[in-house]
Amino acid sequence: MKVAVLGAAGGIGQALALLLKTQLPAGSKLSLYDIAPVTPGVAVDLSHIPTAVEIKGFAGEDPTPALVDADVVLISAGVARKPGMDRSDLFNINAGIVRNLMEKVAATCPKALVGIITNPVNTTVAIAAEVMKKAGVYDKNRLFGVTTLDVIRSETFIAELKGLNVADVNINVIGGHSGVTILPLLSQVKGVSFTDEEVAALTKRIQNAGTEVVEAKAGGGSATLSMGQAACRFGLSLVRGLQGEANVVECAYVDGGSEHAQFFAQPILLGKNGVEKVMPYGEVSAFEANARDAMLDTLNADIKLGVEFVK
């Protein structure tokens, strides 16, 4: 099993690489790429950790050597949010980065499962899909927008609010991966009830949690460590699916035939071909139905921006 991380010298990429080095199955290969010259050194640093995961780092303009024979590709390359920016401000820089990297993925490892972390995910996943279509290698079951950070934040905040063991909290987060498009289905959380006020406040906190971190870091960065953990969880789930493990389910932003938008985050069953099945996200409350319907204009505009960027 070979996993490639593109953008591996950044804040998310280094955290993700560390977690993968310690948690990938024995015998796996981990390949790190970044344009920054420090990247081979990041790999050397991580290579001193005693786990049975072989690691190599590549720098420079061309990610191709890192991508050869990759089974899973996780893309975190791009610029991070600064105070006052929202995820869409990142579009101008990150759109081109994702397009260029995906052209190399299409040419080198078109059958790999690709997880897009680079924001704005609502748009960058659409860009990735269009690049793969242009190359004639698009498989909607092998492309994912990584929305796991919204899930782990929801789990954490619910457990804190209700005094629960966080390991017992399971929640679906649907829609997209920015602002109002992030919709935690709080009504479905088992064994707990929320007041209307709690639902409104918790939903807003989950939607704005990225900004909470950006402001707390006072210009010194964005959510890199929690995102690294979220990306590792999702990447390991992709690997477990590829290895034939049963019942591996994660929420992700996929081209899954949703009635709501071309790309939509909801629970998916993972397997040897990536998406084995898009799962129904279940019954929702009136609050959630309204929030879902209200987000669709924003979500569809984000998707359209990505499609048009490639055309």
UniProtKB/Swiss-Prot annotation:
Binding site residues for NAD(+): G7, A8, A9, G10, G11, I12, G13, D34, N94, I117, T118, N119, M227
E.C. numbers: 1.1.1.37
Stated family: Belongs to the LDH/MDH superfamily. MDH type 1 family.
Residues where substrate binds: R81, R87, N119, R153
Natural source organism: Shewanella denitrificans (strain OS217 / ATCC BAA-1090 / DSM 15013)
InterPro entries linked to this entry: L-lactate/malate_DH, Lactate/malate_DH_C, Lactate/malate_DH_N, Lactate_DH/Glyco_Ohase_4_C, Malate_DH_AS, Malate_DH_type1, Malate_DH_type1_bac, NAD(P)-bd_dom_sf
Single GO cellular component term: cytoplasm
GO molecular function: L-malate dehydrogenase (NAD+) activity
Quaternary structure and interacting proteins, as annotated: Homodimer.
Keyword terms of this UniProt record: NAD, Oxidoreductase, Tricarboxylic acid cycle
A single BP term in Gene Ontology: malate metabolic process
Function summary: Catalyzes the reversible oxidation of malate to oxaloacetate.
Keyword Oxidoreductase attributed: yes
CDD domains, alphabetized: MDH_glyoxysomal_mitochondrial
Location of the active site: H177 (proton acceptor)
Name of the protein this chain belongs to: Malate dehydrogenase
Catalytic activity of the protein: (S)-malate + NAD(+) = oxaloacetate + NADH + H(+)
